[in-house]
């Protein structure tokens, strides 16, 4: 058997810091189970001897107590330890995500990350107690086989042959089932991706019956494939269990009917050997029945290990965070900057650049251009969220690289097109509630929400109101460079005018640099410069 097939699960469980007591307790539990068999057989031999029978009864009671105590310790301790390991995995994935490069994280995908954080960890958690029972059953089989060999070497030989044949048959079934589980896992991720479209685009789905039917049909097709794969996987495990049961019954038949014909001396121990084999059947059946859980847990562990490897590859190199951020906005320089999106084969599908641009301190710069022209990608390059494929970006003469990335980004506050609004002011130190209330009043949403116990009372607001809160949070960060992507698009005409004619001049007067993507040509006068982007390049300059 190729042990490497089980390495993902073992790799995860190897992080356990359990002391050796659980191993000894596991062995003692299995040994006590085998001792019960020997005690029962010995008591049966001495049934006519009252004194010996009483001693056997006391010994039997002691062994039962030992078995129960050790079994309880092993089960409770192992379950607690597995949950500790899974907790460490969740925290490790969270930290890896937080340190990941944005573009590489986008390529990994939400469904993959959510699947590992929830589905895969739940699978391993549910299998934990079952796998502990399997380990114990394996030890019980070993100790019981030793006792069986002491009774009859012929019976032991037949038992070993049956076990080897059964394991080989089961191994092939497990490999087949594992492939089906992998297929089911990928299909399930595909279903979650499609269902995300249903949830996030629910308004559009409700407005278009044809779209709803088409998307529902797509979900139904994926769900049908998922059902078929899981049925085949479950059927494979069911047949595996059936073959295991069959092999046990054939073995019993061989020992009871065949072995006495081949070895006359066996007839004296046939009853004890048969009882021993029947005693082994339980643990052996447990082993066979836990293989589906073992296989599922291994596939889940493999998915987690692969995700962690992908996230580690996507992790940004260590950055020097000790350098303090500049209090005034330094000049931004971009020289020969280029960034490309690529397809699965690595061929560029869209390129932004080359860009040569200088943004002086406290400048108000508007970026205009059609949809898909590259404005949002440019802003992610500008803020250091996307590393350039070519060229150099510098801030105050300090080049953006792996060592300076955190320092560079610490100068930017942003409300991008795909912004996320948090319910708390994460990362904003020493929150001044009065300042928060002043900003909410300035943005005319003080009657809609507020800050209580460090969190907003509600975020169930219109798109424009949510953007106002997002901008208020960006201002609370008090960073020298403010980047906005179509911020005014969801604002009413009156507040849009306030934004361009009052707020932007006020922020500029405070010494902030403002870079904003916009389509509002009637307010271009609020900018010091207006650059036009087309097909990823700045093709026109308006002043």
Regions found by a protein language model. Give the residues of each.
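Juxtamembrane helix-loop junctions of ABC transporter transmembrane domains
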Residues: 36-40, 63-106, 110, 129, ...
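A hydrophobic transmembrane-helix motif
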Residues: 31-42, 133-174, 231-277
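An intracellular "coupling" helix at the cytosolic face of ABC transporter transmembrane type-1 domains
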Residues: 10-17, 102, 119-127, 179-180, ...
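Transmembrane helix-loop-helix hairpins at lipid-water interfaces of multipass membrane proteins
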Residues: 14-70, 149-157, 267
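Conserved "ABC signature" C-loop
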Residues: 415-456, 478
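Cytosolic ends of transmembrane helices, especially the final helix of ABC transmembrane type-1 domains
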Residues: 207, 273, 280-312, 316-317
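Helix-to-loop junction immediately C-terminal to a conserved catalytic motif
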Residues: 383
């Amino acid at each position: 058997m190729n042990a490497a097939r089980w390495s993902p699960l073992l790799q995860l469980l190897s992080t356990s810091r359990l002391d050796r007591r659980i191993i000894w307790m596991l062995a003692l539990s299995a040994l006590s189970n085998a001792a019960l068999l020997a005690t029962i057989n010995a008591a049966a031999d001495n049934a006519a001897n009252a004194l010996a029978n009483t001693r056997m009864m006391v010994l039997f009671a002691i062994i039962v107590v030992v078995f129960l105590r050790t079994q309880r310790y092993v089960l409770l301790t192992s379950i607690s330890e597995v949950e500790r390991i899974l907790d460490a995995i969740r925290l490790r994935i969270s930290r890896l995500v937080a340190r990941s490069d944005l573009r590489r994280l986008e390529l990994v995908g939400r469904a993959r990350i959510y699947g590992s954080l929830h589905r895969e960890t739940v699978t391993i958690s549910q299998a934990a107690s079952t796998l502990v029972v399997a380990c114990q059953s394996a030890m019980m089989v070993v100790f019981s086989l030793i006792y069986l060999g002491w009774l009859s070497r012929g019976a032991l030989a037949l038992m070993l042959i049956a076990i080897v044949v059964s394991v080989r048959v089961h191994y092939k079934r497990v490999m087949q089932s594992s492939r089906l589980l992998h297929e089911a896992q990928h299909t399930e991720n595909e279903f979650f991706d499609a269902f995300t479209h249903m949830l996030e685009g629910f308004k559009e789905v409700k407005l278009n019956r044809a779209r709803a039917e088409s998307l529902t049909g797509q979900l139904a097709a994926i769900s049908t494939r998922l059902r078929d794969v899981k049925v085949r996987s479950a059927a494979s495990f069911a047949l595996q269990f059936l073959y295991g049961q069959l092999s046990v019954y054939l073995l019993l038949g061989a020992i009871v009917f065949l072995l006495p014909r081949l070895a006359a001396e066996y007839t004296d121990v046939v009853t004890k050997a048969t009882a021993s084999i029947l005693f082994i059947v339980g643990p052996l059946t447990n082993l066979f029945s836990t293989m589906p859980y073992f296989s599922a847990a291994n596939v889940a562990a493999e998915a987690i290990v692969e995700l962690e490897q992908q996230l580690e590859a996507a992790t940004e190199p260590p950055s020097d965070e000790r350098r303090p951020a500049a209090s005034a906005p330094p000049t931004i320089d971009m020289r020969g900057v280029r960034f490309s999106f690529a397809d699965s084969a690595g061929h560029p599908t869209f390129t932004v650049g080359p860009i040569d641009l200088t943004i002086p301190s406290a400048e108000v710069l508007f970026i205009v251009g059609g949809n898909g022209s590259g404005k949002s990608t440019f802003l992610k390059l500008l803020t250091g969220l996307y590393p350039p494929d070519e060229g150099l970006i510098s801030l105050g003469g300090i080049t953006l690289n792996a060592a300076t990335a955190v320092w560079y980004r610490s100068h930017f506050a942003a409300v991008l097109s795909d912004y996320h609004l948090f319910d708390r002011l994460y990362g904003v130190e020493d929150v001044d509630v009065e300042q928060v209330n002043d900003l909410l009043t300035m943005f005319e949403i003080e009657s809609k929400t507020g800050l209580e116990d460090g969190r907003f009372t509600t975020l169930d607001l219109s798109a424009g109101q949510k953007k106002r809160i997002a901008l208020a949070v960006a201002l609370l960060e008090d960073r020298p460079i403010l980047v906005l992507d179509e911020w005014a698009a969801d604002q009413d005409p009156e507040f849009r005018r306030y934004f361009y004619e009052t707020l932007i001049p006020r922020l500029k007067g405070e010494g902030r640099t403002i870079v904003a993507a916009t389509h509002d040509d009637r307010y271009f006068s609020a900018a010091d410069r207006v650059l036009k982007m087309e097909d990823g390049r700045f093709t026109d300059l308006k002043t």
